[in-house]
Each structure stands twice: as structure tokens, then as C-alpha cells.
Regions:
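C-terminal accessory regions
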Residues: 500, 618-734
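Accessory, non-ATPase domains that flank or precede helicase/AAA+ motor cores in DNA-metabolism machines
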Residues: 1-306
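Pre-Walker A segment
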Residues: 270-344, 351
Length: 734
């Protein structure tokens, strides 16, 4: 092992720094007066700081000899000259060289104490108001707190980004909080791996066989598996996974499960003869959902209507004739509190949805429309001619103060003011969200659930839509007939063939469905870029912003990560006047297409008509319109609203020229280019291909070897999800 070297000196200049991940390149004036370049984890570093660092000397191919810092201690400057350098170098927002000179002239070597302990005195300096003094002090305290926390966690190998998140949620008490519960680092809102949190905990002196450690591992396994779609884990599997994760005996894992069950952090229940272990929140969501749906199915609907005369009137008004299954759906909607409509593309789901809306209107019911994503809600609004919202917005979702859970404003104590609710793209709804919807409904509120059960299941836990259908308890209409206006679409025909396990002729390039191996002389990536940049805009008059590239995976040459880099370079290259912000291994640029990757219930947005609100949701796609380095913010235009992100929030957005198929769920695009990525085998399934094809409205082009598509059709393997909703609905557990 290479022996570490030590250097001591002061920061002479900051060449580069990224406050999101703490990485910095600095020039250090060593104690002997020499200047050297150093790189490493130095969050909020500024000129004038004193530093003592351990690391190793390396030679960079381009930048020459430099010192790679492994660990370090930093102290703030104490002399007036050094304090001036520190403040003038931009260490504290709101203080530039001129203001720094005035402050240091006034307070000398006491300046930093005044900033932290007596900020009101800053108002004695010309040009600094009381409000500005408070803002300056708050910024200084934040940076001091983050620096102390980061140095503490970095000394145990914890990345600076997690220190920044800890400080965001816990402020000045973050060190105390993480000492008390090291495993909070692995919670969803902080995001460190369990291995990192566990290593930190062991370094703090927690015993390897500590029951608290094993309990933390059990909870982690349940949380981790909920992210893979499971509502519960069989007890024996959970004990074995915990034992393997942290190297303890299965007996100790069972003891931890018992302890957690006693305190109801988890719930153990028997499901079809199997002992199932749930996170308490998922158990409550699943059991509530089952009981409420059974009650809706058992209770009679409210006042009726003469369905046949209504259907005849709707047919006359629309100049259409409903098919038998569509008539059945409308009749069922008239007499059911809850109804499911499922079918593939072109089977008339939208026609039924409009008819049911007319039915509810005839009954005098106030109806809300909602969908899981913003794009799906917008499409629903356009198709139905009335406002639809995201489910989260309808329920008034917001994040709890500790950042760990979602709180819904509409619930059992404050119901939605509607008599009926229609949910589209219901295959995307997980058990937690379905439970929240049901809790917000009045006792006699009706519910229509519309979706395609053959698409990919929800990202979150549960198999809600499929379980409800398979239970046989909920009235369900399966639409299978492809209607005349869609029958000529090869997108629709091929989608249904794929869903049945049949193999379309992908060499038949005609109509709205094409397959290209690659353009002559180029790779698959070159072909995709050329289609987006020139071929489709020029030859088919489809602008690039109406084209969506999809790939099964993030990884590989034709994965979304590489495709987005190539598409950004082609569609939005650097240019004079375009602003940029490096973040991690990507560069955000004005004009970039981006997608929100997690629900943010608190971010403020402004609407185009002057209205404002909070919340941008997973799957929302927009365009970067401004990057303000002074305010450290990025502005994203989401068509109907704009939202500003602080630089520390940029981990919530990604480039969106190319999306994974999973990310595209709930959306439709005028043109879809599907990269036949041969990479991750577990993602090459029939469901992924079917979902990708059904995203296209007017044109679908598959790029790559068609053998990949044929393999996907043959692979109908569906990962098992541990969910008991079907069993509970069908009363098979009694």
C-alpha cells in the first residue's frame, strides 16, 4: 500500500469547484512558499483557508504533477489579509471584493466571529442593510455547518453529496442525528448505500452482532425490495438476505424480525400459508385497499339512469355505433361503484371514457380526472375536453418535514369534493398511491380505472391493476377488438401481435412502422442521431422536439446515458450565448430537454397565466431556459409552468432526448425511435417491447438488429412480485 504524503499551507486560488459533490481543484501555497496543485473532496473551499492534507503525488497527462487529497483538515483564516482573501474570493454569497474590504476594515481579525455570532453588526458597514446582514450570516453559517459535517463524514469515507443532503434536512443538528442513527444515511431521502452507512456505523463502534444493526439491515432489505416492486418478503427469504448482507446468523436475523414486529416497524402476517414480512406502511396500504375495494363492490351504486336511451342519444350525437363490449362497459358503469376498463391500443378505451363521462354528467355527478404523470394527465385533458390533473396534485401531496414520507392533503379527514373519479394509465399506480386515492374518496364516490394490464407494472410496490383484475371481484371489461380507424396502423397491429407472442415481419418497412439496421457507414447511435437531427424533421416534417428516443436500458452504446450525450452534442451543441452548468459527469445547457426523475412536492412553479403552486413530478419533461450562476439556479419550462432549481437540486433532473422504456410509461409521442439495445438481458422482455411500441402515435422506427426484438417477444418472463392484494380481494386468505 502506498504511503501517504502530507502537505500544509493555505489556499491561494480555486481553479474549479463543484459544491454538489465537493470536488475541487485548488492551488495551495505550501509553508515553504512553493505553489502546488491539489485535487479532492473540498466542499465550499475558498482562498485564504488553511489546509493540512494527506494524500499522494500523481502526474496528470494534461495538467502535470498534482497532489491527490485523501483526507484533510481545514481551518478558516485568522489574519485580516487572509480573511479578506477568503471573503473576496466568493466564499460567502453576497460578499464581493468591495464589500469584503469594508467588512474587514471595520472588524479586522474578528470578522468571521461577527459573521457567525453577531450578524446584526454587519449593518454598521456602509451598503449592508439589516436584511442583507442576516442573509450573509445565514449563508456563512450554512457553509460552516456543511464544511464541518462534510469533513466529519468524509473522514469515514462518506461522499460529500450525502453530507449536503443531511444538512438540508437536519441543519446544524446533522452530526448529532447521524451519530445517534448512522443508518439514516441509507434512508431514501439521503441516498447512501447500506454498505456505506454500515461501514460508518461500525467505525463509530457499533458491535457487529448488535441487534440494532441487524434491525437496520432487515428494514433496509424490505425498503430495497419495495423498490423492486415487492409489498412483502417471505420471512425465511428476509432472514437469509439479512444474514448474507451483514454476515450474521439467520437466528439473529429472526430475532431482529421479532423485535421489529413487536414495535410494529414491520408487520408479519400469514399470506396463503406463507409468513410474510411487510413494512408497516405497505401492510396498511394493502389491507386498506383490499377492504375498501371489497366494500365498493358490495354496496349498491346510487341513482340509476336509462342506459339504453343514453347510449342511443350518445350514438346519434357522435355519429357512431358502439361495439357490444363498449355497450357492456357503459352499462356496467351505470350500476357499479367501481369498474375497470382494460385493453390495448386502438381498442376504444377513450371512446368508453368519454361515454362514461357523459353518463356521470347525466347522473349529476361531479367528476375528477387524474393520471399518474403530467404528460398522461395532459393527454387525458385533450381527449376528454375537461381538466385532468396528476394524481399527486389531485391529492395535495407534499413531503414531510423530515423528508422521509409523502403526506397527502386529501385523506380520510378531508375528502375530495367529487362524486366520481376516473384514473387513466392505472397500470402505473402502486399500492401506496391506490390506498391514498381510496382514502380521499367519499363513501359513495364512484371510480373508473382505465389502463392496459399488459404494459409494465408500476415502478413502486405492488401489482395493483393486474391483481384487481385477476381477483375476479372487481367488475372488469376486457377490450380486444381493434376498431376500423386503427386497424390499418402497423403500430397497432404489431403491438397486438407482440402482446400475443407472435413475430411481426420487421423487414416490412411501410406505413407507420419501420426497422433500420443502421444508415450506411454509421453505427446505430449515428443512425439515431441522424434521424433526430435531419431525416425526420426534413423528410417527414416531424420536429425534433416531437421525437422521443427510447431504449430498454441506461447502459451500453445504445443505452440512454450515451444516447443523451450524443443527442445533446447534435441537437443542442455549445454556442455563444448558451449558458452551461457542469453537474457530475454531465453538462446542463440552456435549450436542453430534461426530465424530472423524482416527485418534488415542495418546488415552487409559476404558471403561464400568472398562477403559482408547488410540485413537479416524476416523468415531467421540460426545457432548460436559463442558468443563473449568481443565483445558483436553473430554470426549466414545463410547457404550462416554469420551475427554478437550486444547483444542489440538479440531481433531480436528467437529459431526456433518450428515455428508458420504463420512464416513458404514461406518455405518447408523435414519433418514437426505439434503440434495440442488446445489453441488459433482464430488460429484454415482451412487456418492455410492447410498452415501447405503444408509446408511438404516428411513427415508430426500430434501430438495430431485429433479432433483439424477436428475443424480446419470446421472453415473456415476468418477475414475480410479492403482493397479496389479489388474495385479500378474493378472500383466499381466510
Amino acid at each position: 500500500m502506498q504511503e501517504l504524503s502530507e502537505i500544509n499551507g493555505s489556499i491561494a486560488a480555486v481553479i474549479f469547484k463543484n459544491d454538489e459533490n465537493g470536488y475541487a481543484v485548488v492551488r495551495i501555497e505550501l509553508d515553504d512558499g512553493q505553489l502546488t496543485t491539489a485535487v479532492g473532496c473540498l466542499p465550499y473551499i475558498a482562498p485564504g483557508e488553511m489546509i493540512s492534507a494527506e494524500g499522494s503525488w500523481t502526474t496528470h497527462a494534461q495538467h502535470g504533477r498534482q497532489f491527490k487529497i485523501e483526507q484533510c483538515s481545514r481551518t478558516l483564516p485568522t489574519s485580516p489579509d487572509a480573511i479578506y482573501d477568503y471573503l473576496a474570493g466568493g466564499a460567502v454569497r453576497g460578499i464581493g471584493p468591495a464589500t469584503a474590504a469594508l467588512i474587514v476594515d471595520k472588524f479586522g481579525d474578528r470578522t468571521l466571529d461577527v459573521l457567525e455570532m453577531q450578524p446584526e453588526k454587519l449593518a454598521q458597514v456602509k451598503g449592508i442593510s439589516s436584511n442583507k446582514a442576516r442573509d450573509i450570516s445565514a449563508g456563512f453559517k450554512k457553509q460552516s455547518g456543511v464544511r464541518r459535517l462534510t469533513e466529519f463524514l468524509c473522514s469515514y469515507g462518506i461522499q460529500p453529496i450525502f453530507a449536503l443532503r443531511m444538512f438540508k434536512f437536519y441543519g446544524s443538528s446533522a452530526i448529532e442525528v447521524v451519530h445517534e442513527n448512522p443508518y439514516i444515511l441509507a434512508s431514501a431521502h439521503i441516498g447512501a448505500s447500506f454498505a456505506e452507512a454500515d461501514s460508518f456505523a461500525l467505525s463509530l463502534g457499533i458491535d457487529g452482532d448488535s441487534l440494532n444493526r441487524v434491525c437496520a439491515a432487515v428494514v433496509f432489505e424490505l425498503i430495497h425490495n419495495s423498490g423492486n416492486g415487492h409489498c412483502f418478503i417471505p420471512r425465511e427469504k428476509l432472514a437469509a438476505a439479512t444474514s448474507q448482507l451483514i454476515g450474521v446468523s439467520p437466528e439473529l436475523a429472526h430475532e431482529a424480525i421479532d423485535k421489529l414486529s413487536e414495535t410494529r416497524e414491520i408487520v408479519c402476517d400469514t399470506v396463503a400459508g406463507l409468513e410474510a414480512c411487510y413494512l408497516a406502511s405497505l401492510y396498511d396500504a394493502e389491507t386498506y385497499t383490499a377492504e375498501r375495494i371489497k366494500a365498493m363492490c358490495a354496496s349498491p351504486a346510487g341513482k340509476g339512469v336509462r342506459v339504453e336511451s343514453l347510449i342511443a342519444r350518445l350514438e346519434r350525437m357522435g355519429g357512431i355505433e358502439y361495439a357490444p363490449m363498449q355497450r357492456e362497459a357503459i352499462s356496467l358503469a351505470a350500476k357499479s361503484n367501481i369498474l375497470i376498463i382494460t385493453g390495448g391500443p386502438g381498442t376504444g378505451k377513450t371512446t368508453i371514457l368519454k361515454a362514461v363521462l357523459a353518463l356521470y354528467d347525466e347522473l349529476g355527478l361531479d367528476t375528477y380526472l387524474a393520471a399518474p404523470t403530467g404528460r398522461a394527465a395532459k393527454r387525458m385533458s385533450e381527449l376528454c375536453g375537461m381538466e385532468a390533473s396528476t394524481i399527486h396534485r389531485m391529492l395535495g401531496a407534499k413531503m414531510s418535514e423530515d423528508g422521509e414520507t409523502v403526506i397527502f392533503g386529501k385523506d380520510e379527514d378531508d375528502k375530495l369534493a367529487c362524486d366520481a373519479v376516473i384514473i387513466d394509465e392505472c397500470s402505473m399506480v402502486d399500492i401506496t398511491l391506490m390506498s391514498a386515492i381510496l382514502k380521499a374518496l367519499k363513501p359513495n364516490c364512484r371510480m373508473l380505472l382505465v389502463g392496459d394490464a399488459d404494459q409494465l407494472p408500476s415502478v413502486g410496490p405492488g401489482n395493483v391493476f393486474s391483481d384487481m383484475i385477476r381477483s375476479g371481484v372487481v367488475p372488469t371489461v376486457h377490450l380486444t377488438e381493434i376498431f376500423r380507424q386503427k386497424a390499418d396502423s402497423r403500430i397497432v397491429r404489431n403491438a397486438h401481435m407482440i402482446n400475443r407472442g407472435e413475430h411481426p415481419d420487421f423487414n416490412e418497412n411501410s406505413g407507420d412502422f419501420f426497422r433500420l439496421r443502421r444508415l450506411q457507414g454509421g453505427s446505430c447511435v449515428d443512425t439515431i442521431v441522424e434521424l433526430c437531427r435531419r431525416r425526420l424533421p426534413e423528410n417527414m416534417k416531424i420536429p425534433s422536439y416531437q421525437i422521443q428516443v427510447l431504449s430498454p436500458s441506461r447502459k451500453g452504446e445504445t443505452g440512454t446515458a450515451n444516447l443523451n450525450k450524443c443527442l445533446q452534442a447534435a441537437l443542442n451543441p455549445p454556442a455563444e450565448g448558451k449558458k452551461e452548468k457542469p453537474f457530475g459527469d454531465v453538462i446542463f445547457r440552456t435549450g436542453d430537454r430534461v426530465i424530472q426523475t423524482k416527485n418534488n412536492y415542495d418546488i415552487v412553479w409559476k404558471g403561464k397565466n400568472g398562477q403559482s403552486g408547488t410540485g413537479v413530478y416524476n416523468g415531467d419533461i421540460g426545457t432548460i431556459t436559463d442558468i443563473d450562476t449568481a443565483e445558483e439556479s436553473v430554470t426549466v419550462d414545463y410547457e404550462d409552468k416554469t420551475a427554478r432549481y437550486g444547483f444542489e437540486m440538479l440531481g433531480e433532473i436528467e437529459h431526456a432526448w433518450a428515455l428508458t422504456v420504463h420512464k416513458s410509461q404514461g406518455s405518447e409521442y408523435r414519433a418514437v425511435i426505439l434503440a434495440l439495445n442488446p445489453g441488459v438481458q433482464m430488460l429484454l422482455t415482451r412487456g418492455v417491447l410492447y410498452t415501447a411500441v405503444t408509446r408511438a402515435k404516428e411513427l415508430l422506427i426500430m434501430v438495430g438488429d431485429d433479432s433483439v426484438a424477436h428475443r424480446m417477444i419470446d421472453n415473456h418472463k415476468q418477475s414475480r412480485r410479492y403482493s397479496a392484494l389479489r388474495i385479500r380481494l378474493a378472500d383466499e386468505n381466510s
